[in-house]
């Protein structure tokens, strides 16, 4: 940005009010020289170390920007930032821009007033003129924190065009924080200045990405604004080089337990809350009709099928009419075949007993609709039988009322769709048979099924095909519309029952589940992409990926005591919900390779983008868009002093049930793996791995109910690695206990797979814990190189989970 001294020049005068510009005695002002159509000045704001007026209050900060013109000496409110909630160090995304036509000079003074907003409904941007140095009157719903002011020239001439100003109270005495003003730099590139532009931009972009996408730190896990973000998510990679053995790569992802830390665990976690919610719904049936989660899911499935199949049937019916108008027998037969297939699927979708029972429940729930006994079928309808010829269904109330309701009415309405289709088939057969004898032989089979329908259709000339099929198609559509109308109302009634009991409680549970799932999903996507890239040229892995799917194993170190019970309950549900996730690999069409998540709560698809060169190396099934499934399992063993209390005086049944349930899931995955993978691959796989024995050993350890049986985790991790799975290790913060477990796992791999001598095992273990990425992870989170353990705690830890002397002490956790 160039600063230019001007007197009475044209460029300077257009910034002055007209009355002042005509005064020859007017003083000179320095205008800001900018390219036309560019803003004269842009800057961004950030506050640091703000002092709250009330102790322990979380600030909701807003900055009001006002301008003091050098000529008029009046204070004009110009704009304001957005509100940044819950922090003493807000960074505002809304900058301040002065357009090219705005009268601003180096001598122009800008005043920044910081407020704590208590009621957002009163926060509006206003423009008004006040005498200089007069503070605006206090706004309703906000309290004054402090102010600072500067001249535009001071900002532009400062080092790096950055000012750090002290915020002071209205009397100018007490300092209540700092506000930073930074110019947004948009300069021009001259010859010779662009040599390193690519390197600089990439470096800045990487720095921004690292800063903005960094995982939530341990100290922030209780903040509401970060509750959907995984805690301390990191990739731990060990690459082993050996002169005698093949090089190997081992990845473990470490992350804090996916849980609703902000909401807390006073009433337990999701597993307990969901069970209690279902029990209360079941036992409060007088307020609503109870439907199990399975029935609710079935209702959603049927509604989804309806929405997909109805337009398909209508489309194929129109295609049939189009073929009839063209008098094309082959096209007519093909269109009829497609119509028949889609209509049969449509009819099959309503065979479930849930639709019938929902119709009855909806009728009974209506005022005055208490069903005492089913009405006689004879009095239920006076319409002609659809067996003679499907009539055009007359529009009526989709669910008949008290006096004329018939439980068998649904069967008749539903069956009319099939009968209408049979009439269409019979008519098409008759038309084709009359058009050519040989072409009709294949359709006589259908005619034998419904001889009365075929024989009852009179002969018609060839040119009347469209006119003869049109009424039958219209009847089919009307019958379908009647079925869809009734089914949608009844199944929607089923879904509404889910919310009939304690709607706020249901919404809070849904929110909690979404929070936990979001954290788990972020880690899963990270793990999947890393595993895909490291195994991209492994044909066995790629075949397993699209044939069977991937096992995703979570190792939990949470205790079954106090708040960590709730964390474990949240974590168990969140990881189980990952079964709803499928992956789809697509070719990247641009440099944007960030994954994209689509779908709803019942089913998510994550699209992973690969560059063209990498995408071409994939098997055909994956390139064609086949969905790739994951099988998440969780094994948890508490290892700290709280687990000692739980084992001696509390309850460990939660941990036992989780381990048993997930062992069964792991066993089921192994069974599918052995059935679906090719025999030659299986024979080679079995020579290298004895998974059956490992699974039996794992089952025995789960059944043994041994205290702090960490062998469960060792066996589960080994099985996961041998099945080409993705590994996660979790504790409350993924910082202390997780560090002990991951380093132990790495040393065990070196010993078992890469011939690390047993005499060096402990030395290598201590070295990994004293130096390297684990202690750096601790430093990054709490600014201290100390694991948050004390001597008494470590006495309760299993032997190999204790850090070396000098690496632990009093620290944040």
From Swiss-Prot:
GO terms for molecular function: inositol-1,3,4-trisphosphate 4-phosphatase activity; inositol-3,4-bisphosphate 4-phosphatase activity; phosphatidylinositol-3,4-bisphosphate 4-phosphatase activity. Residues 378-391 have a biased composition (Low complexity). It comes from the Eukaryota. Its EC number is 3.1.3.66. Residues 23-165 form the C2 domain. Strongly inhibited by inositol hexakisphosphate. InterPro entries: C2_dom (IPR000008), C2_domain_sf (IPR035892), INPP4 (IPR039034). GO terms for cellular component: cytoplasm. It catalyses: a 1,2-diacyl-sn-glycero-3-phospho-(1D-myo-inositol-3,4-bisphosphate) + H2O = a 1,2-diacyl-sn-glycero-3-phospho-(1D-myo-inositol-3-phosphate) + phosphate; 1D-myo-inositol 1,3,4-trisphosphate + H2O = 1D-myo-inositol 1,3-bisphosphate + phosphate; 1D-myo-inositol 3,4-bisphosphate + H2O = 1D-myo-inositol 3-phosphate + phosphate. Keywords: Hydrolase, Lipid metabolism. Pathway: Signal transduction; phosphatidylinositol signaling pathway. Residues 1-24, 370-405, 435-460 are annotated as: Disordered. It is an enzyme of class 3 (hydrolase). Residues 1-13, 394-404 have a biased composition (Basic and acidic residues). Transmembrane segments: none annotated. PANTHER family: AGAP000124-PA, INOSITOL POLYPHOSPHATE 4-PHOSPHATASE TYPE II. Catalyzes the hydrolysis of the 4-position phosphate of phosphatidylinositol 3,4-bisphosphate, inositol 1,3,4-trisphosphate and inositol 3,4-bisphosphate. Plays a role in the late stages of macropinocytosis by dephosphorylating phosphatidylinositol 3,4-bisphosphate in membrane ruffles. The lipid phosphatase activity is critical for tumor suppressor function. Antagonizes the PI3K-AKT/PKB signaling pathway by dephosphorylating phosphoinositides and thereby modulating cell cycle progression and cell survival. Belongs to the inositol 3,4-bisphosphate 4-phosphatase family. This is Type II inositol 3,4-bisphosphate 4-phosphatase. It comes from Macaca fascicularis.
């Amino acid at each position: 940005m160039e600063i230019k001294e001007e007197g009475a020049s044209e460029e300077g005068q257009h910034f002055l009010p007209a009355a002042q510009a005509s005064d020859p005695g007017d003083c000179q002002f320095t205008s800001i020289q900018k390219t036309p159509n560019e803003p004269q000045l842009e800057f961004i704001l950030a506050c640091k170390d703000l002092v709250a007026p009330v102790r322990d209050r979380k600030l909701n900060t807003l900055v009001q920007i006002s301008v003091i013109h050098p000529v008029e000496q009046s204070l004009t409110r110009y704009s304001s930032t957005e509100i940044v909630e819950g922090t003493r160090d807000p960074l505002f995304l809304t900058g301040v821009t002065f357009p090219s036509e705005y009268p601003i000079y180096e001598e122009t003074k800008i005043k920044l007033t910081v407020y704590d907003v208590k009621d957002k409904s009163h926060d509006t941007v206003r423009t008004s003129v006040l005498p200089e140095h007069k503070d605006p009157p206090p706004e309703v719903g906000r309290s004054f924190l402090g102010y600072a002011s500067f001249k535009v020239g001071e900002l532009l001439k400062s080092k790096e065009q950055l000012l750090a100003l002290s915020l002071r109270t209205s009397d100018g005495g007490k300092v209540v924080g700092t506000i930073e003003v930074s110019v947004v730099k948009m300069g021009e590139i001259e010859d010779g200045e662009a040599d390193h532009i690519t390197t600089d931009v990439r470096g800045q972009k990487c720095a921004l990405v690292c800063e903005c996408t960094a995982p939530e730190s341990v100290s922030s896990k209780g903040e509401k604004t970060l509750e959907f973000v995984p805690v301390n998510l990191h990739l731990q990679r060990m690459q082993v080089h050996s002169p005698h053995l093949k090089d190997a790569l081992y990845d473990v992802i470490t992350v804090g337990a996916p849980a609703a830390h902000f909401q807390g665990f006073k009433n337990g976690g999701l597993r307990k809350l969901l069970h209690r919610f279902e029990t209360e719904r079941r036992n409060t049936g007088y307020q609503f009709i109870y439907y199990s989660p399975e029935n609710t899911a079935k209702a959603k499935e049927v509604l989804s099928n309806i929405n997909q199949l109805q337009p398909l049937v209508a489309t194929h019916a129109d295609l049939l009419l189009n073929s009839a108008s063209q008098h094309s027998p082959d096209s007519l037969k093909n269109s009829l075949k497609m119509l028949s297939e889609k209509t049969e699927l449509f009819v099959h979708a309503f065979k479930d007993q849930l639709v019938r029972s929902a119709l009855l429940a909806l009728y009974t729930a209506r005022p005055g609709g208490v069903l005492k006994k089913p009405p006689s079928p004879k009095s239920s309808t006076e319409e002609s039988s659809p067996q003679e010829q499907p009539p055009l269904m007359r529009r009526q109330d989709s669910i008949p009322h008290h006096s004329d309701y018939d439980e068998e009415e649904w069967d008749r309405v539903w069956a009319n769709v099939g009968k209408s289709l049979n009439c269409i088939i019979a008519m098409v057969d008759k038309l084709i048979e009359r058009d050519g004898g040989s072409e009709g032989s294949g359709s006589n089979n259908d005619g034998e099924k419904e001889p009365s329908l075929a024989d009852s259709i009179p002969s018609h000339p060839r040119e009347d095909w469209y006119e003869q099929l049109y009424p039958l198609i219209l009847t089919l559509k009307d019958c379908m519309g009647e079925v869809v109308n009734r089914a949608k109302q009844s199944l929607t009634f089923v879904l509404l029952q889910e919310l009939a009991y304690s709607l706020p409680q249901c919404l809070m549970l849904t929110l909690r589940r979404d929070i936990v799932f979001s954290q788990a999903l972020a880690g899963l996507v990270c793990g999947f992409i890393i595993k895909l890239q490291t195994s991209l040229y492994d044909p066995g892995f790629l075949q397993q990926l699209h044939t069977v799917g991937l096992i995703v194993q979570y190792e939990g170190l949470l205790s079954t005591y106090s708040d960590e019970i709730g964390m474990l309950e949240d974590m168990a549900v969140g990881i189980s919900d990952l079964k709803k996730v499928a992956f789809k690999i697509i070719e990247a069409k641009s440099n944007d390779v960030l994954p994209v998540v689509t779908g709803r709560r019942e089913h998510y698809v994550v699209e992973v983008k690969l560059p063209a060169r990498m995408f071409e190396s994939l098997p055909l099934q994956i390139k064609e868009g086949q969905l790739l499934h994951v099988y998440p399992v969780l094994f948890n063993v508490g290892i700290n002093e709280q687990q000692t209390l739980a084992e001696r005086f509390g309850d460990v049944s939660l941990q036992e049930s989780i381990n048993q349930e997930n062992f069964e899931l792991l066993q089921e995955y192994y069974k599918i793996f052995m059935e679906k993978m090719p025999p030659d691959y299986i024979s080679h796989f079995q020579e290298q791995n004895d998974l059956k024995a490992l699974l039996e050993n794992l089952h025995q350890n789960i059944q043994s109910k041994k205290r702090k049986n960490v062998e469960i985790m060792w066996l589960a991790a080994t099985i996961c690695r041998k099945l080409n799975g993705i590994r996660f290790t979790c504790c409350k913060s993924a910082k202390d206990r997780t560090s002990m477990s991951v380093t132990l796992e790495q040393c065990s791999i070196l010993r078992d797979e890469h011939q690390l001598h047993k005499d060096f095992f402990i030395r290598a273990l201590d070295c990994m814990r004293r130096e390297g990425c684990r202690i750096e992870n601790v430093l990054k989170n709490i600014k201290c190189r100390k694991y948050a353990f004390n001597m008494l705690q470590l006495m309760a830890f299993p032997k190999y989970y204790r850090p070396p002397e000098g690496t632990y002490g009093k620290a944040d956790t």
